[in-house]
C-alpha cells in the first residue's frame, strides 16, 4: 500500500519538476489535555546516552610485517604466524595489516609486558598446594613452555604445554571465506595434579592500539550498544571494564536474596565485540559462537595497560567459592572440582569501507543469526499493552485479592483504542489465575472467573492482533503450588538454593527438569483457551547451573531452545539474550541504553539494528517516561515500539502488594498519553514497518538519519531547536520521514 502511494506521489512530483518527498509529523490524535512530558520542549543535554559524529581520520599501518614468520597460503589470503608467540598478521584489500599484537619493540615496554602482548593465549591457574589457591599467570614465553605447530587446511593447529603448570592446550586458527576462526576444544585441555585451569584469555591484543596512534573506536555490546573512542591515557580511570556475557554467574555467591545480586549496569545480550581502525576504512567484528555462557568481555584502558587499549574475550573454567560450614555464617574457601566443560570458538569478521563501523557490525551479526520471522500485514506499527488482572496481598487474617482489570475492561480499552486508529495490538494478560501476578508462578491451570469468562477471552482475541498469557516457570513462589521445596529446587555449588525475596513472597529457582515439566503441563491445561501464545518470564535472561543434577549452562540453553521450538504457540520473551532469538516471535523490554559508564563515549542501537526487520521489538513501559518526547524519539531512532502496563482500577489498589512500584497504570489516566505517544511513533515507523535498517548517520551531534532497505530514511532531531538539513527543516525534538 505504501509503495503504490509513493509511486503515485512521485508521478505527481515529477509533473511539477520536483522529486523530493518528505513527511512531517502532525499529531493525528486530538486531545484537549496537555501532556507536559510530551508537549513541553525540554533542553537538550548532550551525553554518552547519544551517538556522536566520528571523524574519518585516515588510519595508517602502525607495524611492519613479521620477519621469519610461517606464511600459510589460505583460500582468503596469506596468514603470517610468529611461531614463538602464535601471533598472526593478515593484510586486507586496502593494504592495512591486521595484527594480533602491537608494535611492541619500543622504548618503555618491559620484557614481561612485551611477552604478554605477543602471546596468543594467557592462562591463569590455581595452585592446589596453596591453602588460598594462589593464582599463577602464564603466557607463551614462560620458561619451559613448548609449542608444536602443524599446518592444516587454511591455517594451523598448535599443541601448547605451559612451562610452569604443565597445562596443555590445543589451539586451531584458520582463515577461510574472509573469516578468521579461533578454536580451543575442551578435549585438548589437559591439567596436571597441582595446577588447575582457571581462565584463558584468547588473543588479548588483537587490534590493540597504543595511545592515539590509530583513530577509531571499540564497540561493546553493553545494553543496546556502546562505543569507546581510542584516546590518550586518563589517570582518573580506576579500573578496566570486565563483564560476563549473559549477566553475572549466580552459582558461586552466598547471597540469600538474589534481588541484591544484580548486574552493575546493563547486561551483555550477545557475545560479540569489535574494533574500528579508521571509521569507514577497516574494522573487525568478533562473534563468540561457542563458550559464551562461561565467557566474559574485557576492555583494557590505556591508563591501566601501559598506554594500550585492547578488547578481548576470556573464558572461565574453574572458580573458588565460599562454603558455609555452620549457621553462624562461618565459611571456608573451596575450589570447584570439575572444570566447566565447553569448547571456545570465535569468528573474526573483517569489514571494510562503508561497513567498517558499528552499523556494519550489526548488519553482519543479523546475517550470521540468519533468523527470518514473518510480520503482520497491517500498515501500522504494533502497540503492546500488558494487563494486570488479579494481584494478591497479605491481609490481617487471610490473603486479599485485588481485581485490577476484568476482561470486559480490556475489551473496552481495545474499542477505545480502535476509535483512535490503534488496531495493531499485542495484549498480554498477567494475573489471569486466582493467585494473581506474584503468587501464581509456576502454576497456571485455568482462568479465574473473577476477571471473566472464556467467551470474553475470545472477544479480546478477535479485537486484538495477538493475545498472550503472561507466565513464569523458573521462579516458583512459596505461595503457589505445583512443586515442593524439598525436592524441586535447584542448588548452587555450595548446596544453597537460589532465592528471591519480595514484600509478599519468596521465589525459588527450580530444577531444570521441573521447569520443563511445569511448562508442558501448563500449556496442556491452558490449551482450551483462545489465545495465540505465551509471554514466558525468565526464559530469555535467566541462566543458572543446577548442581543438584549436574546441569550446566550449556545444557540449560539447549533444553530451553528445544522445548520452545517444539511448541506451536506464539512465544514472546522479555529482555532476552541472543541464544533465545531463534525461538522468539517478539521481543519485549528491549534495552534502550548502554550502562552509560563515564568511560563510554556513545550509546549506539547495535542490538535493535541487528534485529530490525527480524522480529517486533517493544520498549519498556512508557507509563514512567519523565521526558516522554526524548524517549519517543529514541524509539523512532532505534525502531522500537511503545508499551504500557495497564489496569482498569487505580494503581493505588496495588499498595502493599509486590506490584506497588507501579505508581500509574489506570487506562483512564493514561489513555491520552497512549494515543499521543503511539501516533507520534507510528507516523514515523509505519513507513518502514518490517524493514531492515541499513545505515545510521549522525548528521550533527543531536541529529540522526536512519536509512532502511526500502530506501526510506527518517531524520530525528533530538535538539531543542530546529535543524536545517539541506533545506529540510526538522523542528525541535521532532522528525521528518523522507523517501530517497
What are these regions (language model features)?
Residues 83, 92, 186, 204, ...:
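Glycine-rich, histidine-containing beta strand-loop boundary motifs that form or position
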Residues 422-433, 466-471, 524-546:
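Short acidic catalytic loops
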Residues 27-377, 714, 719, 727:
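N-terminal accessory beta-strand-rich subdomains and adjacent acidic, glycine-rich linkers
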Residues 74, 81-92, 269, 275, ...:
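Active-site-proximal substrate-binding groove within the catalytic cores of carbohydrate-active enzymes
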Residues 7-26:
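Sec-dependent N-terminal signal peptides of Gram-positive bacterial secreted proteins and lipoproteins
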Residues 347-426, 660-691, 696-698:
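Terminal accessory/anchoring regions of large secretory-pathway or extracellular enzymes
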Residues 378-459, 467-517:
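Aromatic-lined carbohydrate-binding/catalytic grooves of carbohydrate-active enzymes
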Residues 1-5:
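N-terminal secretory signal peptides that target proteins for export/translocation
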Amino acid at each position: 500500500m505504501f509503495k503504490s502511494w509513493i509511486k503515485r506521489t512521485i508521478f505527481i512530483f515529477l509533473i511539477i519538476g520536483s522529486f523530493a518527498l518528505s513527511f512531517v509529523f502532525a499529531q493525528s490524535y486530538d486531545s484537549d489535555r496537555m501532556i507536559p512530558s510530551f508537549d513541553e520542549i525540554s533542553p537538550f543535554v548532550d551525553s554518552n546516552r547519544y551517538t556522536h559524529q566520528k571523524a574519518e581520520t585516515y588510519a595508517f599501518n602502525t607495524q611492519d610485517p613479521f620477519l621469519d614468520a610461517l606464511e600459510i597460503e589460505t583460500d582468503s589470503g596469506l596468514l603470517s604466524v610468529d611461531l614463538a608467540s602464535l601471533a598472526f598478521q593478515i593484510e586486507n584489500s586496502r593494504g592495512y595489516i591486521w595484527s594480533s599484537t602491537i608494535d611492541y619493540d619500543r622504548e618503555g615496554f618491559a620484557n614481561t609486558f612485551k611477552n604478554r602482548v605477543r602471546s596468543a593465549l594467557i592462562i591463569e591457574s590455581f595452585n592446589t598446594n596453596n591453602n588460598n589457591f594462589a593464582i599463577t599467570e602464564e603466557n607463551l614465553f614462560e620458561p619451559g613452555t613448548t609449542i608444536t605447530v602443524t599446518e592444516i587446511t587454511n591455517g594451523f593447529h598448535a599443541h601448547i604445554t605451559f612451562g610452569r603448570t604443565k597445562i596443555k592446550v590445543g589451539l586451531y586458527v584458520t582463515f577461510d571465506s574472509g573469516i578468521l576462526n579461533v578454536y580451543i576444544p575442551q578435549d585438548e585441555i589437559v591439567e596436571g595434579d597441582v595446577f588447575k585451569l582457571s581462565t584463558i584469555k584468547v588473543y588479548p591484543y588483537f587490534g590493540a592500539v597504543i595511545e592515539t596512534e590509530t583513530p577509531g573506536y571499540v564497540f561493546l555490546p553493553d545494553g543496546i550498544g556502546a562505543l569507546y573512542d581510542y584516546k590518550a591515557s586518563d589517570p582518573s580511570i580506576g579500573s578496566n571494564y570486565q563483564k560476563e556475557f549473559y549477566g553475572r554467574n549466580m552459582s558461586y555467591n552466598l547471597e540469600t536474596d538474589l534481588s541484591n545480586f544484580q548486574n552493575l549496569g546493563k547486561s551483555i545480550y550477545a557475545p560479540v565485540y569489535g574494533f574500528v581502525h579508521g571509521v569507514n576504512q577497516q574494522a573487525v567484528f568478533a562473534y563468540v559462537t561457542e563458550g559464551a555462557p562461561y565467557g566474559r568481555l574485557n576492555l583494557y584502558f590505556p591508563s591501566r595497560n601501559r598506554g594500550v587499549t585492547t578488547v578481548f574475550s576470556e573464558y572461565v573454567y574453574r572458580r573458588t567459592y565460599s562454603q558455609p560450614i555452620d549457621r553462624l555464617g562461618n565459611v571456608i574457601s573451596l575450589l570447584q572440582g570439575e572444570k566447566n566443560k565447553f569448547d571456545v570458538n570465535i569468528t573474526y569478521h573483517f569489514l571494510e569501507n562503508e561497513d567498517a563501523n558499528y552499523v556494519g557490525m550489526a548488519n553482519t551479526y543479523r546475517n550470521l543469526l540468519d533468523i527470518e520471522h514473518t510480520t503482520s500485514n497491517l500498515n501500522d506499527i504494533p502497540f503492546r499493552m500488558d494487563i494486570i488482572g488479579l494481584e494478591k496481598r497479605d491481609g490481617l487474617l487471610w490473603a486479599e485479592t485485588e481485581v485490577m482489570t476484568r476482561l470486559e475492561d480490556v475489551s473496552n480499552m481495545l474499542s477505545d483504542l480502535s476509535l483512535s486508529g490503534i488496531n495493531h495490538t499485542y495484549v498480554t494478560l498477567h494475573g489471569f489465575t486466582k493467585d494473581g501476578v506474584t503468587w501464581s508462578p509456576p502454576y497456571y491451570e485455568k482462568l479465574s472467573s473473577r476477571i471473566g469468562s472464556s467467551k470474553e477471552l475470545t472477544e479480546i482475541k478477535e479485537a486484538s492482533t495477538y493475545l498472550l498469557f503472561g507466565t513464569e516457570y523458573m521462579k516458583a513462589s512459596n505461595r503457589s503450588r505445583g512443586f515442593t521445596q524439598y525436592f524441586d529446587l535447584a542448588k548452587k555449588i555450595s548446596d544453597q538454593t537460589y532465592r528471591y525475596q519480595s514484600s509478599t513472597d519468596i521465589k525459588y529457582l527450580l530444577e531444570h527438569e521441573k521447569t520443563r515439566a511445569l511448562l508442558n503441563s501448563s500449556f496442556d491445561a491452558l490449551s482450551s483457551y483462545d489465545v495465540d501464545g505465551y509471554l514466558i518470564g525468565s526464559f530469555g535472561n535467566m541462566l543458572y547451573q543446577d548442581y543438584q543434577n549436574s546441569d550446566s549452562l550449556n545444557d540449560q540453553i539447549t533444553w530451553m531452545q528445544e522445548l520452545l521450538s517444539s511448541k506451536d504457540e506464539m512465544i514472546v520473551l522479555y529482555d532476552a539474550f541472543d541464544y533465545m532469538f531463534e525461538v522468539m516471535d517478539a521481543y519485549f523490554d528491549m534495552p534502550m541504553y548502554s550502562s552509560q559508564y563515564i568511560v563510554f563515549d556513545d550509546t549506539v542501537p547495535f542490538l535493535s539494528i541487528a534485529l530490525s526487520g527480524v522480529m517486533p521489538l517493544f520498549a519498556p513501559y512508557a507509563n514512567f517516561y519523565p521526558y516522554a518526547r526524548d524517549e519517543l524519539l529514541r524509539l523512532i531512532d532505534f525502531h522500537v515500539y511503545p508499551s504500557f502496563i495497564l489496569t482498569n482500577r487505580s494503581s493505588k489498589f496495588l499498595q502493599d502488594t509486590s506490584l506497588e512500584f507501579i505508581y500509574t497504570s489506570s487506562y483512564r489516566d493514561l489513555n491520552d498519553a497512549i494515543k499521543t505517544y503511539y501516533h507520534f511513533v507510528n507516523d514515523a515507523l509505519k513507513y518502514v514497518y518490517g524493514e531492515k535498517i541499513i545505515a545510521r548517520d549522525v548528521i550533527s551531534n543531536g541529529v540522526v538519519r536512519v536509512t532502511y532497505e526500502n530506501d526510506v530514511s527518517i531524520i530525528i532531531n533530538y535538539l531543542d531547536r530546529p535543524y536545517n538539513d539541506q533545506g529540510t527543516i526538522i523542528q525541535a525534538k521532532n522528525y521528518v520521514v523522507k523517501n530517497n
